[in-house]
Amino acid sequence: MYPDDSLTLHTDLYQINMMQVYFDQGIHDKKAVFEVYFRQQPFNNGYAVFAGLERIVHYLKDLRFSDSDIAYLESLGYHGAFLDYLRNFKLELTVRSAQEGGLVFANEPIVQVEGPLAQCQLVETALLNIVNFQTLIATKAARIRSVIEDEPLMEFGTRRAQEMDAAIWGTRAAVIGGANGTSNVRAGKIFGIPVLGTHAHALVQVYGNDYEAFKAYASTHRDCVFLVDTYDTLRIGVPAAIQVARELGDKINFKGVRIDSGDIAYISKKVRQQLDEAGYPDAKIYASNDLDENTILNLKMQHAKIDVWGVGTKLITAYDQPALGAVYKIVAIEDETGKMRNTIKLSSNAEKVSTPGKKQVWRITSREKGKSEGDYITYDGVDVSDMTEIKMFHPTYTYIKKTVRNFDAVPLLVDIFKEGTLVYDLPSLTYIQDYARKEFDKLWDEYKRVLNPQHYPVDLARDIWQDKMDLIDKMRKEALGEGEEE
């Protein structure tokens, strides 16, 4: 059976299992707080670009159990009273999130979910699915953008994406990260992204030679970018493109040629020479062929003559790191008295120990230099913008510290839903792109390096750090038995 449009059951089975446990024990409506964060920067990068909020909003707005959902869950053995609870499900969650296009960093909350425990549990899988994928693609695009600077970047990866939804949402994420357009027509229609298409090698093969193929294409399409590497780029493809451009003159807009194979650095220089000598200095050279930021960086070091970059497989699949690794952890739970109790997850791996409590992240920016000095994590309700001085220190290597003065502090997490009601106006994609560029400009160059960037400071307020240490000590003592030594 073809799947319906409902995403409510886009979750792991154990979420439903836990929801029924909470329901049976009468704690399903207990208030809880969960936070999404990732532990390491993707691609060993100095930053990540947050993406996925728009899809999160649509997912949560439409969250309800259909009759077919209930029937299927009944077939899995869930009991009647619990199914009645699901049948009457109404979103009551309060959600805060980073804004799309904003820079985010490891070990800070980027989405925060508060509300009835069972509802918080239900949405975990979908939220992680969305954030893990889209943030990864946006970050990959930003890395490529940082290497090519102001040159056009086209997303060409649809056929290599992990299925159709990944292709269109991945395209949108790539645009947030810095792509100028896409070859994906559906993404262009849905999101208003500029679309660009040339033609494939098949066109040349159908006609048997470049000249006839280019002439046929030009008879239908005025804007012409000819793919010149089907047989021989320099001896056949480019000369044929020039011949067609000359013969048709002003009847077409000869925009340039595309190279999809071979030694692109060497070939592009020769192609540039051929085009210039033929009187087409404004014709652009488009390059594709399994490009990414590392390949492009090397091509630029070799002074390749590329004007437009088409990046497909390695962008849309985040080829060198296929998973962001974001997690969703409970940080506070309502106790028997109705008060919120901070909670922590311990681990033998230090990086997997969670940070307790409902928090806010503050982006600290120097007023004098206009650059971000770091992110400062406080308990929710603390207003850092009123402070005149912040003493920041590394939460693990506490001897690494600095004092910041004369700063602006902007909260990272903004209100999206309040008790199930959407309170956030989704911005246009153009606005998100502009916001992303402005946020990126605030980052010091040391954090932007593609290779071995400097570590961006993400520091805990002293009271959070101390509470975390105290909770670790308390939980370990309880696990070992009161008074026992480890």
Specify the residue positions occupied by each region the protein language model found:
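Buried, small/hydrophobic-residue-enriched core segments of structured protein domains
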Residues: 1-31, 40-42, 77, 83-92, ...
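Gly/Ser/Thr/Ala-enriched C-terminal appendages of enzymes
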Residues: 1-30, 44-45, 278, 283, ...
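A residue-level signal for beta-strand positions that form part of recognition/binding surfaces
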Residues: 33-35, 92, 153, 327, ...
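Short, positively charged
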Residues: 75-83, 163, 389-397
